[in-house]
Amino acid sequence: MEKEYIHIILADDDEDDRMFFTDAFDELKINTKVQTFINGAELMNYLNEDTCILPNVLFLDLNMPKKNGIECLLEIKENERFKDIAI
């Protein structure tokens, strides 16, 4: 039986920030799955897929190309499907 994990998504266009973020969670003694996206458009495309596994926690960079964190946040808050995601 597979252990439950905390599904975490980070949307950030800075490669170093994504690396530091994932490394920090790797060092924790909790079972996590960290998924990263390089911009808000990529994140929203994923979240809007029918087969998407919704995260428990979502971290958004405010300044990203294509779609910034504020635009993503507004779009997420408008969708009832995403109401249980901690942002």
Q: Where are the model-predicted features located?
A:
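Two-component/phosphorelay signaling modules centered on CheY-like receiver
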Residues: 15-38
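Conserved beta-strand elements of the Class I
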Residues: 7-9
